[in-house]
């Protein structure tokens, strides 16, 4: 058999797509205080950053993946809301307006593993997000 067609699959996205957001609020939260949609109590005192983006944008509601803020990986806490989700920044104090990387070509597999899915689902989940295309 001889074919003249190639299916590129993930090669079309890998390394070419990043999802960047920003911190919309950050605060110290005490153990037992409620964070996220439906109210998930925190197990420890910690710093929490609230990131713009929620299930309306393609963030998994029940188990949002974490994000990178200030070079630190921050695990998600609570259930994502329609427009915001929370991450535990631990000792790092995030600033309002600070850049947040949800994933990029290097970290999409981590996001997929946290959501117990494949990279393709992470790349294609985003809906109303503003796209920025750069010529390379």
What are these regions (language model features)?
Residues 1-136:
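Active-site anion/phosphate-binding pocket segments in diverse small-molecule metabolic enzymes
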